[in-house]
Swiss-Prot record:
Catalyzes the oxidation of carbon monoxide to carbon dioxide. This is Carbon monoxide dehydrogenase small chain. Binds 2 [2Fe-2S] clusters. Its cofactor is [2Fe-2S] cluster. One of its GO terms (molecular function) is metal ion binding. It catalyses: CO + a quinone + H2O = a quinol + CO2. Keywords: 2Fe-2S, Iron, Iron-sulfur, Metal-binding, Oxidoreductase. Heterotrimer consisting of a large, a medium and a small subunit. The lineage of its organism: Bacteria, Pseudomonadati, Pseudomonadota, Alphaproteobacteria, Hyphomicrobiales. Its EC number is 1.2.5.3.
Length: 4
């Protein structure tokens, strides 16, 4: 999961 990518987190900004």
């Amino acid at each position: 999961m990518a987190k900004a």
